[in-house]
Amino acid sequence: MTPSEAGRRGETAVCQYLLQRGYTIRKRNYRIRGGEIDIIAQKGEILAFVEVKSRRQSEGFPLEHLSPQQQLRIVKASLQYCAAENPDWALQPRYDAVAVVTERGQIVSIEYIENAFDASGLDAIR
């Protein structure tokens, strides 16, 4: 399985995970110039911008690969999404991250972290 196939499989599993917990999936793979959000999901008044990191068990913990630069790109993409889809800010944005661990092509675990990061301090990153 290629890394992109593993990533898609991980994202699909996370969508199922979110649906089982009462979320509505609003968008997958939302792209703007310079950024992408894997999953945008809503539950009540929360609009979750979800970054999915899939790795084989032998490659270490997936969220170790979520850099401050990537967080900044996600925040920028979320601001553009909100400007278009949530202009009155009726929904509260939240930045979540998910670690999907695989072994031999099978998903071993999903660790969902709400409020994994926020925009504070990211403006200093270039």
Give the location of each predicted region.
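Catalytic cores of nucleic-acid endonucleases
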Residues: 54-103
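Conserved protein-kinase catalytic-loop segment immediately C-terminal to the catalytic Asp
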Residues: 38-41, 99-101
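Conserved catalytic cores of phosphodiester-cleaving nucleases, focusing on short active-site segments
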Residues: 18, 39-58, 74
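Domain-level recognition of nuclease-like catalytic cores that cleave nucleotide substrates
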Residues: 86-126
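Short acidic/glycine-enriched loop/turn segments that link adjacent beta-strands
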Residues: 32-35, 106
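Residues at secondary-structure transition points
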Residues: 1, 5, 9, 34, ...
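Acidic-basic catalytic patches of nuclease active cores, encompassing PD-(D/E)XK
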Residues: 1-28
